[in-house]
Amino acid sequence: MNTKRAYKLQEFVAHSAAVNCLKIGRKSSRVLVTGGEDHKVNLWAIGKPNAILSLYGHSSGIDSVTFDASEGLVAAGAASGTIKLWDLEEAKVVRTLTGHRSNCVSVNFHPFGEFFASGSLDTNLKIWDIRKKGCIHTYKGHTRGVNVLRFTPDGRWIVSGGEDNVVKVWDLTAGKLLHEFKSHEGKIQSLDFHPHEFLLATGSADKTVKFWDLETFELIGSGGTETTGVRCLTFNPDGKSVLCGLQESLKIFSWEPIRCHDGVDVGWSNLSDMNVHEGKLLGCSYNQNCVGVWVVDLSRTEPMSGGATQSNSHPEKTSGSGRDQAGLNDNSSKVILGKLPGSQKVDPLLKETKSLGKLSVSQNSDPLPKDTKSTGRSSVSQSSDPLVKEPKPLGRFSATHSSDTVKESRTLSSTGSVSDSPHRVTLTSAPKSASGISTVVPNAAASKRNFGKANPKANPPVVNKEDYFPVIVPRTEPIIEQASESRAELDIIGRTMPYSLQSKAADSRRLSSSRNEPDLPTSSLLERSQSQPIEPITLQDGNTYPSDEGGSWDTAERTNKESKCRVFGRFNSRSLVRSPPRNHDENSDLISYNANRDSSPTESRKGGRLHSLVLNRERRGRFSNFEGPVSSSSGGNMTAPNSRPSNMLKQRGNHVPVDQGITSASEEDIVADIMGQHDQFVSSMHSRLAKLQVVRRYWERNDIKNSISSIEKMADNAVIADVLLIVNERPEILTLDTCTSLLPLLTALLGSNMDSHLSVCLDLLLKLVRMYGSQIYSSLSAPSSVGVDIEAEQRMERYSCCFVEFEKIKACLPSLARRGNLVAKTLHELNLTFQEVSS
């Protein structure tokens, strides 16, 4: 293992002539594209000495290259001014675009549209439409060449820096200059946007870094002066510092306040690009026809190394770059697995406080170190999951708590830490972080926009499988076995599961139970699931969702295949039920427990003895007609029962005499049948919890679009209803873009047979139709505008998608109205609203 703060990863000959430009792929940080004077564009896998692709076709030297967001396209600008767009999968030219009169020295793709921008030594900045194969706008204003340009993360502005020492901000919608910054005294060489704030950093040949407020267009401050010009700069993903690449060193600045924290001598010469990946800074430089790849371990630099040690007591100081990370080589996944400590098994602390769904997320979903104690507030430890980096809870999604939840939390806090087993319980007290500042996803029409909408964290908006850290799911199942053998272990389990369930697990060997045991609420069953690690779930479309915070798609899928025959629960019901001893006291009570909380088996009392009689036909058909949310998981999960079995006896008070000759084998079958169904119920709760955890990861990053996309892949009506209930209470996130993604889910949920699901669905539909219905119907009937308007085109596409879904929903309403039930009133309101907006 390399112990240096900075080292050269590799150096290779990239072209037969001088290298002019290069770019690192931002999505994976595993690929590199270079352009040279030999008229070639070469694609490289970082760590490999040979090119993956060599693209021919340019007639002059390549002066600029860049990847698109998916790393499937490369744009290359040549000295002749020609730009070629390459499809890397097909290894061919997709577009050849001409228009610049001189060298094209900078290119940048729009973050989510099919557009890209180019800057040239002819002083012009051009916007190109990939679909229309041409330039759609030219911005003039620079007096010298345009060296660097970047789209803002929300895609509405583009910022350019030129050799005239000026930084210009252009509004793409209005097609005009918004503002220009003229404080630099040398040519602009680099710029970057803060991942969370409306802030721009610029680096110049005048050896300074300047920070600009993009709301007020004021200079916040300046860092430097350095010994050489600032060739590259990038914000750290936590947003607290900016990394500046100089001629042969790296400087780390904070912007609030502006000061230099650290400097690292690296050795690169003509630094051309930098990117932060997995706690490492990757820098690429070129010299003549060679390219060098350099790595700086940010966990060994200030302020990241200092902040990592304070993660428990000061969550706001935790830096994502201070975590254990893997080196950049072919065995990176093995290194990651090796570095994850055993104590970093994440406990799912997701509860349901009501049967149909208000999500209550514990304020601390990260694992606690062994020595962490409850301090009256949420403790945060370092997580190896790149999806969870200083999450900002979205208001009520993580704040729904009942008094019982708080009460249980205090009880857990008083008992101290539990055991060292996989059943670790994170000790938290009264919810505090839920009352923190809610991050609001802004409306598309808002004048002051937040970059968090398009880039809520430092991670790219496209989530890649490689972004997940693998965690090995434990295969051993010792806990229940120990519980049945050792009374001491039962004490440990007693602290992690409700008393009613604890007594059943402990006493099932001797088949005794308390009389008239109360029904178990859903929350009690979920509490039991909290003490058990959740195995991954595989959906029919091939996507595997990890159950742990640090789980990976690949590892979870592999583990799931190896354990297909295993139920989600940590134990098999037959292993809990043992044959009673021959001298079993007949005066002891038989278990009277039913997994369906709305009905119970018939009881009889004879001669002071309580027996439970469950007929064989009842055992065969007890759970045959449960109605629950649709689940497509391959494990055959059963969802939470919500309706009564038709073949159960209705009255508790009916007493049926029992023969004395019931054998212990039949008693064992009865209990095994009951407990077996209970395991299926618990496994369905595990499945539901795992799915909700996946949604929560995106939600914590304010990535609403990917949250909705993941729910759609799960195809589980219960999960859809849970999340839609929260969305319904957060009107500020119901933008037109969100509406486009939500409507297909709502259309699918209308097919549910559960009134509670329909109620949630119709309430949200009513709100969406009132908000956007009139806009959608009026826009589609209006004449098309003259000229090119990117925003208008995208808006019309969303309107069309919403219109199609609205028509599908209107077709479903008559059949729902015939059902009568509790949703009839909402249906009537929805019909009237549709008539109003479409008239």
Swiss-Prot record:
Loss of function: phenotype: The double mutant ktn80.3 ktn80.4 exhibits normal growth, but the quadruple mutant ktn80.1 ktn80.2 ktn80.3 ktn80.4 has a severe dwarf phenotype, with small and round dark-green rosette leaves as well as wide and short petioles, probably due to cell elongation defects, and associated with a complex cortical microtubule (MT) network with stable entanglements. Plants missing KTN80s have a disruption of KTN1 recruitment at MT crossover or branching nucleation sites, leading to an abolishment of MT severing.
Location relative to the cell: Cytoplasm, Cytoskeleton
Alphabetical list of CDD domains matching this protein: WD40
Cross-referenced SUPFAM superfamilies: WD40 repeat-like
InterPro entries: G-protein_beta_WD-40_rep (IPR020472), Katanin_C-terminal (IPR028021), KTNB1 (IPR026962), WD40/YVTN_repeat-like_dom_sf (IPR015943), WD40_repeat_CS (IPR019775), WD40_repeat_dom_sf (IPR036322), WD40_rpt (IPR001680)
GO molecular function list: microtubule binding
Chief subcellular location: cytoplasm
Region feature Disordered, mapped onto this chain: 303-340, 357-435, 501-561, 575-648
WD repeat spans: 14-54, 57-96, 99-138, 141-182, 184-222, 225-265, 267-304
GO biological process terms held by the UniProt record: microtubule severing; regulation of unidimensional cell growth
Motif (DWD box): 115-131
Keywords for the protein's UniProt record, in alphabetical order: Cytoplasm, Cytoskeleton, Microtubule, Repeat, WD repeat
Protein purpose: May participate in a complex which severs microtubules in an ATP-dependent manner. Microtubule severing may promote rapid reorganization of cellular microtubule arrays. Confers precision to microtubule (MT) severing by specific targeting of KTN1 to MT cleavage sites such as crossover or branching nucleation sites. Together with other KTN80s, regulates cell elongation by modulating MT organization.
Subunit composition and interactions: Component of KTN80-KTN1 complexes composed of a hexamer of KTN1-KTN80 heterodimers that sense microtubule (MT) geometry to confer precise MT severing. Interacts directly with AAA1/KTN1 and KTN80.1, and weakly with KTN80.4.
Stated family: Belongs to the WD repeat KATNB1 family.
HAMAP family from the UniProt entry: Katanin_p80_B1 (MF_03022)
Protein name listed in UniProt: Katanin p80 WD40 repeat-containing subunit B1 homolog KTN80.3
Taxonomic source organism: Arabidopsis thaliana (Mouse-ear cress)
